[in-house]
Amino acid sequence: MKNTLSLILALLLCLSLAVPACALPENYVGETLEDFTVRTTAGTDFTLSEALKTHELVVVNLWATWCPPCRAEFPFLEEAWEQYAEKVEVIALTVEAKDTMDVITKFAEQYGMKFSVGRDEANIFRKLGGMYIPTTLIIGAGRKILAVEIGGKPSAAAFTEWFDRYLAKE
């Protein structure tokens, strides 16, 4: 019994040391995001570096069609983006491999998503060690990751406050 307890405690200690070492998405703040190009539901290509030539910030939202918090935050993201469209570009990328472009297009129409929508063909979510969705990144000049947030935002105001904070820094 004593050996079993010692073994369990040793395993728990190892796990507690390993978890902080994991590459959590938040740990990528300050890093440069690899440039990427993805096809959008509009049939056009979205390239991160090109979007940053015309916008101060790019918001990369990683989501899935089956994710309730993702669906809940899209109307808020849309509303905020419409107010900031001249300075902030948004690309929403599904991380669900099973989501076809037809499924994504219908989903975007259903949720009134007018910003760019596509699939995470560049595997951003995986490269950032993503485990939870939605995960949203703010990218600034030079493709620098300024912020990473896991979980949905509860209002358009939450997005606009976030945009204002990082526009002021750029």
Task: Place the predicted regions along the sequence by residue.
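Structural microenvironment flanking redox-active thiols in thiol-disulfide oxidoreductases
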Residues: R71-Y111, R119-K127
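Bacterial N-terminal signal peptides
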Residues: I8-A18
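Hydrophobic beta-strand anchors of alpha/beta hydrolase catalytic cores
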Residues: V59-V60, V90, T136
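A short beta-strand-turn-helix
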Residues: T37-V58
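Thiol/disulfide oxidoreductase modules built on the thioredoxin-like
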Residues: K106-K114, R119-Y166
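Short pre-active-site segment immediately N-terminal to redox-active cysteine/selenocysteine motifs
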Residues: E56-V58, L62-W66, Y132
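N-proximal helix/coil linker or "cap" segments that precede and/or mark the start of modular domains
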Residues: V19-D35, L52-T54, K106
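Positively charged n-region of N-terminal signal peptides that target proteins for export
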Residues: M1-L7
